[in-house]
Amino acid sequence: TSRRQRQMCIRDRKSEDKELYYRVRDAVGEIRKYVTDKLGCQIIDNSLLIKLEKIPVIPEQFMGIGQFSSKEEYVYLCILLMFLEDKDAQEQFILSQLTEYMTAVMPGEITDWTLYNNRRKLIRVLRYTVEQGMVRVTDGTDDVFMDDAGGEVLYENTGASKYFMRNFSRDIMEYTKPEDFRESEWFEVDEDRGLARRHRVYKRLLFAPAVYREDGSGEDFEYLKYYGYRLSEELEQLFECHVQIHRGSAFLLSGQDCRMGAAFPENNSLADILMLAFGKIREKIEGKVWKITPEEMSLVDKIEFESLILDVKKEYGSGFAKLYRDMPEGEFIKNVTDEMERWMFIKKVDDMHQIKICPLVGKIQGSYPQDYTGGNENEQ
């Protein structure tokens, strides 16, 4: 199997790209052997789709569903999956059947479809399930429901929804806290040794932008200490990337030809703003204004950090896209810090009103050319 085949995103729906589906299907034996051995992940392989179940070691800020912005949308998704569970593949249903089912399962304000916000959230969930190939629109447009609770749309169940949720090794009704979901397959296994430790290290490197010693087991960095060179060679050969291991952090940096997942910086204005901010942060740290802890972190007062973000806007704002030039200060700070947190550049320590600056900030920064005079006022 070629390296390109190994790099494929193992979540190909046959109906969308048959050629890619069959290419992955031909290579799935070797891919399954690798991900089972190194990551402890399972592959679902059937006539509908091929999916790699990527279960993280540590839930991170960026791992939610990006299209969702509220808890209610996750509730709607779970009830929708319950609704589809009773439907056959290719079975059709109209939107009012779903809304009536949801109201019966969870009566109250959350399923009051006369409220525009509820309708908007449900449509966002349905659009997500369409994107994921769980349902398809057969007739109509969801805008009519957005405008009026009586609006109808005809959907078709593809049968793929039953493979969306993770299969747990234990009855989750026994769980009492979020931590119970973490790595439930390692229940009653010595997690700091052998196979489980290797799976943790590979997952943390491949599924997140950064690995920090303080976040997980210290045994993970012991593994990197002894096996890091061999692991680096292997991943660099397979995925066209470069692994860097430090005292308190480790990173998988994508190469120019790497096609594995999302990468920073993305080609957008917000990424440019972050890189400009990183340059300012670096100046503070190199100037000993902001101190570094033994774990390679820097703990800064939240107000002081937000002041730096605003300084970046004041100094470089003329070169920003119009959206960010005109954005109110509070909204600008939130957009920038949320994006930094999403990529694991910072952690918000809300109970202490502080920002923890992580080592990944030191890996990248940006600046405008010295002769740059500002942005185009006509830019949209």
Annotate the PLM regions.
Residues 40-41, 126, 130-141, 239-243, ...:
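A short, conserved structural fragment
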Residues 82-155:
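Internal, well-ordered domain-core segments that constitute the primary functional module
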Residues 146-199, 360-380:
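Short, amphipathic alpha-helical interaction segments positioned at domain boundaries
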